Amino acid sequence: MVLSTKRVAWVLVLAAAAPSALAAPKKVSGGDQRQEVSITVYNQNFGLVREVREIEVGTGTVDLEFRDVAAQIQPQTVSIKSLSGANALSVLEQNYRYDLLTPQKLLEKHVGKKVRVWRWNEKLGKDEPFDAEVLSVAGGQTVMKIGGEVTYNFPGRIAFQSVPENLMSKPTLVWKLESKLAKQKVEATYLTQSLNWRSDYVFVINDADSAGDLTGWVTLINNSGASYKNARLKLVAGDVQRVSDGDDHRRPMGGAARMSANRERQFSEESFFEYHLYTLSQPTDVLENEQKQVTLLEAKGAKVQKKLIYFGQQYWYRSKYGEVQKNQKVGVYLDLQNTKDNGLGMPLPKGTVRVYKADKSGAKQFIGEDNIDHTPRDEKVRIKMGEAFDVVGDRKQMEWRTLGACTSESTWEIELRNHKDQASRVEIYEPIGGDWTMVESTHKHDKKDAHTFTFDVNVPANGKTKIKYKVRVKWC
């Protein structure tokens, strides 16, 4: 038998199984029967789906196929109840079928069975049919018996008479129900993975670095394997405890996501348990493989304070340290007060703040970004912008001596140099361990906590400032 070298063309000829072949008639409910849908999305990559459908269930013991659920559903979290009566519906059995129809699965289900194959006949100038038996599909290669020969990688197309009953085109919940009403309004709820949201903030500051306009966006990512049209949307901000069961059938969802944006719809916020709940004011479409952005907040002229901070290290006080730490970087930060007086005063979900500033031509330039944690109202937000280019520092240990088995005394000198044409204010943060005492210093220090003291110094334009201090540390 001579086989053509033409590329394999997969053609699946699918014929629906006759109802008479089924063990019992099944009731089917699809997404087109949804009357209500709401989703609550958590910023830990999962969500709660609640939907209401009106279904012709029938009475007695019935099988219901509940289709168009999320592909990333956690079936052990599913709950169903009737809204038509307290005892109108009871669940006898629940199954989740996710053995999905693919060319490979179709072949696997036909191992040991007959199929029809077609190959190109050069002499006839058309495809020629043959009966074949599928022997194996192991390793992704199809082995078949055609006539008296066994072959693999057949260069043609394969046709199947029908789809095996246990292969589903979409993930489907199947319930065996005891129904007392023929037509019922049914509510189903479940958790699904791959629904996520995050906050993205855009902060445009003024020329003086003293204020700016802050816009907060909710970015919703739906890779759950389902679309939710005209859905009521709620978001939960907070760290919700979850348990991993270690038994996850779900597949990773790939593909590029579409992006849509809406600046008009706004969220209302409320405290909920020990978290915060944000509710979108009107329904929205959350489509499969989509990123949607909705405005969370807008604050005009929010005051901000730029800070230059120079950090030390705890371990420097434990031993003699001979090396000079030269040209150490000075961090640049923006401090923003989350208060009503500052145009904010609402719980800020964790997310990324991206900061922009206009140059002399008026064009906005990106100047830094940082992640912020969940921030309650009336708390400070600190944004790390980067490191100063023109302000640097040196640190060196001038003296070090032991005063006992676990007590030492050391003298340090910090030199800050400012290469800008205007003065700069720099905060020096000195973390220190053990039981410590400031013996002497050239500048006033501030004890922030048990293990931190600071200096707040002015560094003149194109000049330098030296700070010298002696500290005694007991660590046992």
Summary of predicted features, one role per range:
Residues 2-7, 16-476:
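Long, intrinsically disordered, low-complexity accessory segments associated with secretion
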